[in-house]
UniProtKB/Swiss-Prot annotation:
GO terms for biological process: gamma-aminobutyric acid receptor clustering; nervous system development; neurotransmitter receptor localization to postsynaptic specialization membrane; regulation of inhibitory synapse assembly. Its main location: other. The chain crosses the membrane at residues 22-42, 97-117, 127-147, 178-198. One of its GO terms (molecular function) is GABA receptor binding. One of its GO terms (cellular component) is postsynaptic membrane. Pfam families: L_HMGIC_fpl. It is a multi-pass membrane protein. This is LHFPL tetraspan subfamily member 4 protein. Interacts with GABA(A) receptor subunits. Interacts with GABRB3. Interacts with GABRA2. Interacts with GABRG2. Interacts with GABRA1. Identified in a complex of 720 kDa composed of LHFPL4, NLGN2, GABRA1, GABRB2, GABRG2 and GABRB3. Interacts with NLGN2; leading to mutual regulation of protein level and synaptic clustering. Keywords: Cell membrane, Cell projection, Membrane, Neurogenesis, Postsynaptic cell membrane, Synapse, Transmembrane, Transmembrane helix. It is found in: Cell projection, Dendrite; Postsynaptic cell membrane. It comes from Mus musculus. The gene is Lhfpl4. InterPro entries: LHFPL.
Length: 247
């Protein structure tokens, strides 16, 4: 084997080990993002009360709990995604839809992991990358649309008269909203990494095909040529000598 071929083989083995390790980490963080997506969709802790709010309570995408404002901290909870009429704002409905779509996309991406056993690795990486990018986009839309519903009467009763669109008044942002923003960054990084892994797999496949073609040509030529340089099957033909007869 030529030195260049040995170097190429070593590079290929080294890259395959590293790509498998990176791919495993990518899959683990994809599952983590899916968990984040499910949590931020279900949990009602997107915005909540503070020490100066007229009433205690907290709001999510579709589920919310608000107190009466009297002594005690008893909360009345309402809202269900299956019953849109219980959601206090159309902006909340739209935000819930986009976050749900993001959750469906990332769960579909995890389902596509099974394709690694049947399809080309580069193709699967690129499919997952697009799904993660779309999931991030849907989550961005959900986070941007959600504050548009802060002027709903139910939220104004809890957060005070200063509350309006994109203004929480006396209320504050809770951990689920922050977790959704972290999830967006996570999804964008995962999508970029999947595109890189997919493109590298494509380049590696092309290099392997080129190397196989070179090896095939070299093997064919070496099998045709003899060690001494003669072409196999072509013997040295005797030179015909003209015999002249005497007078």
């Amino acid at each position: 084997m030529l030195p260049s071929q040995e170097a190429s083989k070593l590079y290929h083995e080294h890259y395959m080990r590293n790509s498998r390790a990176i791919g495993v980490l990518w899959a683990i963080f994809t599952i983590c993002f899916a968990i984040i997506n499910v949590v931020v969709f279900i949990q009602p802790y997107w915005v909540g009360d503070s020490v100066s709010t007229p009433k205690p309570g907290y709001f999510g995408l579709f589920h919310y709990c608000v107190g009466s404002g009297l002594a005690g901290r008893e909360l009345t909870c309402r809202g269900s995604f299956t019953d849109f009429s219980t959601i206090p704002s159309s902006a909340f409905k739209a935000a819930a839809f986009f976050v749900l779509l993001s959750m469906v996309l990332i769960l579909g991406c995890i389902t596509c992991f099974a394709l690694f056993f049947f399809c080309n690795t580069a193709t699967v990486y690129k499919i997952c990358a697009w799904m993660q990018l779309l999931a991030a986009l849907c989550l961005v839309l959900g986070c941007m649309i959600f504050p548009d519903g802060w002027d709903a009467e139910t939220i104004r009763d809890m957060c005070g008269a200063k509350t309006g669109k994109y203004s929480l008044g006396d209320c504050s942002v809770r951990w689920a909203y922050i977790l959704a923003i972290i999830g967006i960054l996570n999804a964008l990084i995962l999508s970029f990494l999947a595109f890189v892994l997919g493109n590298r797999q494509t380049d590696l496949l092309q290099e392997e095909l080129k190397q196989e073609n070179k090896d095939f040509v070299g093997t064919t030529v070496s099998s045709v040529l003899r060690p001494g340089g003669d072409v196999s099957g072509w013997g040295v033909l005797p030179c015909p000598v003209a015999h002249t007869q005497g007078p």
